[in-house]
């Protein structure tokens, strides 16, 4: 069965969580940078390995419009895996949003943007870019 994004527009996260008996819900530490934002769409998964953010750029290239980048950063909070530039590219490509169990940067710009971003935290430091991660694999992001 295929669902359209509009099928989910009026369904709350609490209703989904209840229907799924609390399974596959995000950890409470992952929060929207803009409280008015919500996101729905097919997940395009990204697995971060050894704090390498190069795989995020592969995901931006490969993800289909309407998809949500779900970045499994293993809970890392000492570096930011994306910021304002990545969000601008994701928005231009028509992605639905970004969710990460790690950190982003450029919090002021991201919180004022009309693009849904859900993060564990904010930190200005960037990681390495040597391409160790993977895309479109099973990931565990935020719980």
Task: State what each model feature region is.
Residues 1-143:
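Feature captures the catalytic cores and cofactor-binding loops of soluble hydro-lyases/lyases
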């Amino acid at each position: 069965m295929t669902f359209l994004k509009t099928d989910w527009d009026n369904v709350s996260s609490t209703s989904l969580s209840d229907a799924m008996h609390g399974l596959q819900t995000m950890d409470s530490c992952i929060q929207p940078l803009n409280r008015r934002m919500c996101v729905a769409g097919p997940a395009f998964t990204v697995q971060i390995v050894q704090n390498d953010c190069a795989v995020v750029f592969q995901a931006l290239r490969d993800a289909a419009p309407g998809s949500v980048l779900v970045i499994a950063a293993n809970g890392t909070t000492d570096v930011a895996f994306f910021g304002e530039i990545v969000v601008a590219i994701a928005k231009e490509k028509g992605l639905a949003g970004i969710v990460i169990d790690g950190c982003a940067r450029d919090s002021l710009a991201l919180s004022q943007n009309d693009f849904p971003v859900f993060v564990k935290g904010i930190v200005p430091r960037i990681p390495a870019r040597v391409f160790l991660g993977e895309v479109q694999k099973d990931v565990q992001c935020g719980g």
